[in-house]
Amino acid sequence: MDRFVWTSGLLEINETLVIQQRGVRVYDGEEKIKFDAGTLLLSTHRLIWRDQKNNECCMAIPLSQIVFIEEQAAGIGKSAKIVVHLHPAPSNKEPGPFQSSKNSYIRLSFKEHGQIEFYRRLSEEMTQRRWETVPVSQSLQTNKGPQPGRVRAVGIVGIERKLEEKRKETDKNISEAFEDLSKLMIKAKEMVELSKSIANKIKEKQGDVTEDETIRFKSYLLSMGIANPVTRETYGSGTQYHMQLAKQLAGILQAPLEERGGIMSLTEVYCLVNRARGMELLSPEDLVNACKMLEALKLPIRLRVFDSGVMVIELQTHKEEEMVASALETVSERGSLTSEEFAKLVGMSVLLAKERLLLAEKMGHLCRDDSVEGLRFYPNLFMTQN
C-alpha cells in the first residue's frame, strides 16, 4: 500500500480511461484496510481508486510499478480478486495513504463482479505498455525514472529476476491454454454451422423432414443453449450488464417470437431464456431491467405492459390494429368466446388471449358479458350495424 499516492482523480494530458468498476475493496496483502468500497479506474498510465462515499479520497498507482498480476477465484462468502504484485516504492515517491508497508502486493476485491473484463483490460495494458510510448505529466514520470533505493538494496535484482522468470512461465502456460481453447472454438464453430443447417431444414421443411423430426430438432437446438451467456462476472452489475443482456435477448428471442405470432408473456420468456442459459441462471429483476432497455437500444423486440400490469415481449413489427382485427374476426365467426376458448383456437396462453380480448374491448370492437359462468366476449354490434 505504500506505492499508492494521493491524486485528484483527474486524467492527465495524453492519459486515457480504459475501464472502471464500482464496489471494489483494496487489501494490503492479506490485511483488510479502511478502503472498503470504491470505484476502481484503469487508465493507460495508472490504477486509480476513488471512495464512493467521499470523492475527495482518491489514490493512484502508476502501471509502471506493477510487476505482474494474477486472478484469485471467488469462494464461499468471498468475492473474486485480482492480485497485483508491485515493485518497491521509489525513494522520491509522493505522499500517499501509507508511508511504509511490509507487503509487496495488493489485492482488489470485486464485490459487484466485473473482475473478468477488468483483468483482461489490465493485462492488455501491461502487455502494450502505453505509458512508455505516450508520456504524461512530470508527476507521473517520476515513478518511471531510476529508483535509488533499489540500487542500494542487495538481492532486489535477484528477486526481480525470479519474478520475471515466473511471469514468462505464466505467459507460456497461458499460451498453451489458449491453443487448447482455439481448438475448442473450432469445434464450436462446426456445431454452430450444424445448428444453422438444422434450423434451415426446419424453416424450409425440405426433403423428408417430418413433423416429429421437426419437434425433435427444435429440442436439440434448445438443449444446446446459449454459447456465451452474458454474466455479471463479465460485465459487472450496472447498466453495461443489462445492455449486453438486452442485446443477447434480442438475438435468442426473435425466432421463438415469430413462431408464436409475435408476442410472448414475460413468464414464458423467463423460462425459455433460463433453460437456454443452463447453469448461468437469470434473476427476474435482471430480466425485467434488460427488457426495459430493448426499445431504447432500437432492437427488433420490445417490452410492453398492458393496463392490467401483465408484461409481454413482442416484435417491433407486431401491430396492435392487426392483433385486434384478428381477435374480432375470430369472435365474430364463433358468435362469442371466453378467453380459454379463444386461447385454444389461436394457440396461445390464456393470459395473452385474455389481454388480446380486453384490448379489443377497450378499442370498442368487443363487448363483454360477465356472469357466474365467467367472462364472455361478443362482437360490438353498435360498431358494425346501423
UniProtKB/Swiss-Prot annotation:
<keyword id="KW-0175">Coiled coil</keyword>
<dbReference type="InterPro" id="IPR036388">
    <property type="entry name" value="WH-like_DNA-bd_sf"/>
</dbReference>
<keyword id="KW-0967">Endosome</keyword>
<dbReference type="GO" id="GO:0031902">
    <property type="term" value="C:late endosome membrane"/>
</dbReference>
<keyword id="KW-0804">Transcription</keyword>
<dbReference type="GO" id="GO:0000814">
    <property type="term" value="C:ESCRT II complex"/>
</dbReference>
<dbReference type="Pfam" id="PF04157">
    <property type="entry name" value="EAP30"/>
</dbReference>
<keyword id="KW-0963">Cytoplasm</keyword>
<protein>
    <recommendedName>
        <fullName>Vacuolar protein-sorting-associated protein 36</fullName>
    </recommendedName>
</protein>
<dbReference type="GO" id="GO:0005829">
    <property type="term" value="C:cytosol"/>
</dbReference>
<dbReference type="InterPro" id="IPR036390">
    <property type="entry name" value="WH_DNA-bd_sf"/>
</dbReference>
<keyword id="KW-0539">Nucleus</keyword>
<dbReference type="GO" id="GO:0032509">
    <property type="term" value="P:endosome transport via multivesicular body sorting pathway"/>
</dbReference>
<keyword id="KW-0813">Transport</keyword>
<feature type="coiled-coil region">
    <location>
        <begin position="160"/>
        <end position="185"/>
    </location>
</feature>
<comment type="function">
    <text>Component of the ESCRT-II complex (endosomal sorting complex required for transport II), which is required for multivesicular body (MVB) formation and sorting of endosomal cargo proteins into MVBs. The MVB pathway mediates delivery of transmembrane proteins into the lumen of the lysosome for degradation. The ESCRT-II complex is probably involved in the recruitment of the ESCRT-III complex. Its ability to bind ubiquitin probably plays a role in endosomal sorting of ubiquitinated cargo proteins by ESCRT complexes.</text>
</comment>
<dbReference type="InterPro" id="IPR037855">
    <property type="entry name" value="Vps36"/>
</dbReference>
<dbReference type="InterPro" id="IPR011993">
    <property type="entry name" value="PH-like_dom_sf"/>
</dbReference>
<comment type="subunit">
    <text>Component of a complex at least composed of ELL, SNF8/EAP30, VPS25/EAP20 and VPS36/EAP45. Component of the endosomal sorting complex required for transport II (ESCRT-II), composed of SNF8, VPS36 and two copies of VPS25. Interacts with VPS25, SNF8, TSG101 and CHMP6. Interacts (via GLUE domain) with ubiquitin. Interacts with RILPL1 (via the C-terminal domain); which recruits ESCRT-II to the endosome membranes. Interacts with ECPAS.</text>
</comment>
<dbReference type="GO" id="GO:0005770">
    <property type="term" value="C:late endosome"/>
</dbReference>
<dbReference type="GO" id="GO:0016197">
    <property type="term" value="P:endosomal transport"/>
</dbReference>
<keyword id="KW-0472">Membrane</keyword>
<dbReference type="GO" id="GO:0043130">
    <property type="term" value="F:ubiquitin binding"/>
</dbReference>
<keyword id="KW-0446">Lipid-binding</keyword>
<feature type="domain" description="GLUE C-terminal">
    <location>
        <begin position="105"/>
        <end position="138"/>
    </location>
</feature>
<dbReference type="GO" id="GO:0005634">
    <property type="term" value="C:nucleus"/>
</dbReference>
<dbReference type="GO" id="GO:0005764">
    <property type="term" value="C:lysosome"/>
</dbReference>
<dbReference type="InterPro" id="IPR021648">
    <property type="entry name" value="GLUE_dom"/>
</dbReference>
<dbReference type="GO" id="GO:0015031">
    <property type="term" value="P:protein transport"/>
</dbReference>
<dbReference type="GO" id="GO:0032266">
    <property type="term" value="F:phosphatidylinositol-3-phosphate binding"/>
</dbReference>
<keyword id="KW-0653">Protein transport</keyword>
<comment type="similarity">
    <text>Belongs to the VPS36 family.</text>
</comment>
<dbReference type="Pfam" id="PF11605">
    <property type="entry name" value="Vps36_ESCRT-II"/>
</dbReference>
<dbReference type="InterPro" id="IPR040608">
    <property type="entry name" value="Snf8/Vps36"/>
</dbReference>
<keyword id="KW-0805">Transcription regulation</keyword>
<feature type="domain" description="GLUE N-terminal">
    <location>
        <begin position="1"/>
        <end position="88"/>
    </location>
</feature>
